[in-house]
A protein has these predicted regions:
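A non-catalytic alpha/beta surface segment that caps or lines the substrate-entry region
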Residues: 1-35
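Acidic, glycine-rich active-site loops and adjacent beta-strand->loop/helix elements
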Residues: 14, 46-48, 104-112, 134-136, ...
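Active-site metal-coordination/substrate-binding segment of hydrolases
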Residues: 20, 27, 34-105, 126, ...
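Acidic-glycine-rich active-site phosphate/pyrophosphate-binding loop
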Residues: 49-63, 141-154, 272, 303
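Glycine/charged-rich beta-loop-alpha catalytic/anionic-binding loops adjacent to active sites
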Residues: 59-72, 156-159, 277, 309-313
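A short glycine/serine-rich beta->alpha loop
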Residues: 66-75, 159-163, 201, 319
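Acidic/histidine-rich catalytic neighborhood of metal-dependent amide-processing enzymes
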Residues: 71-148, 193, 204-205, 213-216, ...
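Metal-dependent amide/peptide-bond hydrolase catalytic core
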Residues: 171-340
Length: 340
């Protein structure tokens, strides 16, 4: 970004022990005569899921870029960054008129949007913007996402030798009973819930006195989400009490939901840029969060642009070169439309 002539500032996100680097805020000043147009931003994240070290990208005859199969490709979200860099290069080479553009390159997105949560808001100077980080096809815009809550539960029983089970209280038994009572899966059209991790115990000949369960619920409806989380919490607690044990339940919000209208300026530029290029221009509601979920809470309207990568978070991840070209063209078109 510095080599392309941008002013680059690092925030202090790495002060948090779970982040190994800072976020970058890179600013491309407006071209002459375009100081009055809306200031916008784009964001992509620089981290990937594991295994993501020593990635060896391979362009195959089908037009897709793959890894060698031993790592993820990391197109989520290196593809977003690549398209942003190519856009800047094109703007510079072709001297395209443009307003001020910021590029927010975050850390820790895959760890729970932690970089965006630690982002220094005082460094952001934009009226609206775009997260370049959706698995949808290029030309599709994500205009909404759910709120996600995590529910972590520790269940305590009483240890005993397995040959004398009546002298103990099995934490595993309590957990199994609670899960059996619990409403999980697709709760309603807006809400899902899941218990994803369950571990504990020390040996087959010991009644387990402690187990830990990690779960989540997410919803586009805050009331439905609150009801579901309370249902899960109360089910753990009442079941444990009925069977002589105890449940310690911890609940935390990972990211808030958001919903942007198709008529909003930020969405209109995404739709128009896509349709101008012959792309779908459709808008969708996503089932997961992104850095855009967090930046929307900073009162900066944000939607998420489809990047076109496929099979993310697996060693089969791939992206067509055509999608990268289309994405770059859409980013440039957004800048051009805003500058008119």
């Amino acid at each position: 970004f510095i080599d392309l002539g941008l002013n680059v500032v690092e925030d202090n996100a790495s002060k948090r022990e779970w982040l190994g680097a800072n976020n970058l805020i890179c600013t491309l000043p407006s071209s002459e005569g375009k100081e009055h147009v809306s200031k916008i931003y784009f964001t992509s994240h620089m981290d990937t899921v594991v295994p993501g070290i020593n990635v060896k990208p391979i362009l195959k005859e089908d037009g897709y870029v793959y890894s060698d199969g031993t790592t993820v490709l990391g197109a989520d979200d290196k593809a977003g960054i690549a398209a942003l860099l190519e856009m800047i290069q094109t703007i510079n080479e072709q001297e395209l008129p443009h307003g001020q553009i910021q590029f927010i390159i975050t850390v820790g997105e895959e760890a729970g949007l932690k970089g965006a949560k630690e982002l220094d808001q005082n460094l952001i100077d934009a009226e609206f913007g775009y997260a370049v980080d959706a698995s949808q096809a290029v030309g599709t815009t994500v205009v909404g996402a759910p709120t996600q809550m995590i529910i972590n539960t520790t269940i305590y029983g009483k240890t005993a030798h397995a040959s004398k089970p009546n002298q103990g209280i099995s934490a595993i038994h309590i957990a199994a009973k609670a899960i059996n009572k619990m409403h999980l899966g697709q709760i309603d059209q807006d809400t899902t819930a899941n218990i994803g991790k369950f571990y504990g115990g020390s040996a087959t000949n010991i009644v387990a006195d402690k187990v830990i369960l990690e779960g989540e619920a997410r919803s586009h409806n805050d009331k439905s989400l609150e009801y579901q989380i309370n249902h899960m919490k109360e089910t753990f607690e009442t079941t444990a009490k009925e069977l002589g044990g105890k449940a310690n339940v911890e609940i935390s919000k990972i990211y808030p939901g958001f919903r942007r209208n198709d008529s909003e300026t930020v969405t209109q530029y995404a739709i128009k840029s896509a349709k101008t290029l012959g792309l779908s221009g459709k808008t969708v509601i996503a089932g997961g969060g992104s850095d855009g979920s967090i930046i929307n809470t900073y009162h900066i309207p944000t939607v998420i642009l489809g990047v076109g990568y496929e099979h993310i978070h697996t060693t089969s991840e791939r992206i067509p070169v055509a999608a990268l070209n289309q994405l770059t063209s859409q980013l440039i078109k957004i800048v051009e439309l805003v500058a008119k």
